[in-house]
Structures are given as C-alpha cells and as structure tokens.
UniProtKB/Swiss-Prot annotation:
PROSITE patterns: SCORP_SHORT_TOXIN. GO terms for cellular component: extracellular region. InterPro entries: Scorpion_toxin-like_sf, Scorpion_toxinS_K_inh. Expressed by the venom gland. Only expressed by males. The record marks M50, N51 as: Important for activity. Belongs to the short scorpion toxin superfamily. Potassium channel inhibitor family. Alpha-KTx 06 subfamily. Gene3D superfamilies: Knottin, scorpion toxin-like (3.30.30.10). This is Potassium channel toxin alpha-KTx 6.11. One of its GO terms (molecular function) is ion channel inhibitor activity.
Amino acid sequence: MKVAYLLVLFTIMMLANDASLVHTNIPCRGTSDCYEPCEKKYNCARAKCMNRHCNCYNNCPWR
C-alpha cells in the first residue's frame, strides 16, 4: 500500500513540474540560445532547446 501511495505522489509531482513548461516558437541551436529570450519573456532563465525550439520553464523559485 505504501508503494502505491508513493507512486501516485511521484506521478503528481512529475505532472506538476511538466505543467510549468511553456513551448515556444523561439528558434535555437543549443540550450544556451534559450536562456536570454526565456528570461525576457517569462522572467525565468530556466530553458531547454528541444527540436530546435526553446522550451521555457516558468517555475523559478526566487519569484
């Protein structure tokens, strides 16, 4: 029973983190190309370059 509870809790945490991901049309060649545009647009420099487009995260802990 404890394992099932932990599995549900882990799944909810993963889904909540994915909800903070914002897909954009900002072109990129590497993750470092995304930091500045994402910080300007979402006030958070957390980003990834995926499929040549920036994905910004808007869950910065210091906001």
